[in-house]
Amino acid sequence: MFSMVTGFMNYSQQTIRAARYIGQSFVITLSHTNRLPITIQYPYEKSITSERFRGRIHFEFDKCIACEVCVRVCPIDLPVVDWRFERDIKKKQLLNYSIDFGVCIFCGNCVEYCPTNCLSMTEEYELSTSDRHEDYTIQTVMNSTQIKIDKDKPFDSRTITNY
């Protein structure tokens, strides 16, 4: 008989403990009802980026001196800098500068080490497109206007990864 009373006491203690845990959980749930929502409705509301956000890289063609520091500090050797040496002025003349944003890891090394500050990180983070061929096109900047390289040329894996 004593074991039956002890079992009933253990059962009642466990029931009271379970009710207490359920009550505590309910109080926590009710405390969250007065809070404002944290999530944003993405397509309709844009998130505010921080001051040092590393978005799409902006390039100013006129400031570049074709020193290729950006290529040397890039962990994946991504920027492609085409230039020719002008003998009459004894300087490099930039012909073409391109970065493939499908491969870029947005580390910001090129922006940080650029001696002329011709590279900068923008707050643009929507780089995806609905056309799968646009994802791997190389963005080229000439005369401060952005144009895309011929999309009719097919890209293969060697073209995209070997620079």
Swiss-Prot record:
Binding site for [4Fe-4S] cluster 2: 74, 104, 107, 110
Key words, A-Z: 4Fe-4S, Chloroplast, Iron, Iron-sulfur, Membrane, Metal-binding, NAD, NADP, Plastid, Plastoquinone, Quinone, Repeat, Thylakoid, Translocase
Compartment list: Plastid, Chloroplast thylakoid membrane
Domain (4Fe-4S ferredoxin-type) ranges: 55-84, 95-124
CC per GO annotation: chloroplast thylakoid membrane
Assembly information from the UniProt record: NDH is composed of at least 16 different subunits, 5 of which are encoded in the nucleus.
Binding note for cofactor: Binds 2 [4Fe-4S] clusters per subunit.
SUPFAM superfamilies: 4Fe-4S ferredoxins
Annotated membrane topology: Peripheral membrane protein
Similarity-based family: Belongs to the complex I 23 kDa subunit family.
KW Signal (keyword) present: no
Catalytic activity: a plastoquinone + NADH + (n+1) H(+)(in) = a plastoquinol + NAD(+) + n H(+)(out); a plastoquinone + NADPH + (n+1) H(+)(in) = a plastoquinol + NADP(+) + n H(+)(out)
EC number(s) on file: 7.1.1.-
Enzyme class: translocase
Protein name, UniProt field: NAD(P)H-quinone oxidoreductase subunit I, chloroplastic
Cofactor: [4Fe-4S] cluster
Organism for this UniProt entry: Phoenix dactylifera
Stated role: NDH shuttles electrons from NAD(P)H:plastoquinone, via FMN and iron-sulfur (Fe-S) centers, to quinones in the photosynthetic chain and possibly in a chloroplast respiratory chain. The immediate electron acceptor for the enzyme in this species is believed to be plastoquinone. Couples the redox reaction to proton translocation, and thus conserves the redox energy in a proton gradient.
Binding site for [4Fe-4S] cluster 1: 64, 67, 70, 114
Listed GO MF terms: 4 iron, 4 sulfur cluster binding; metal ion binding; NADH dehydrogenase (ubiquinone) activity; quinone binding
Presence of the UniProt keyword Kinase in the record: no
The gene coding this protein: ndhI
InterPro entries for this protein: 4Fe4S_Fe-S-bd (IPR017896), 4Fe4S_Fe_S_CS (IPR017900), NADH_quinone_OxRdtase_chainI (IPR010226), NDHI (IPR004497)
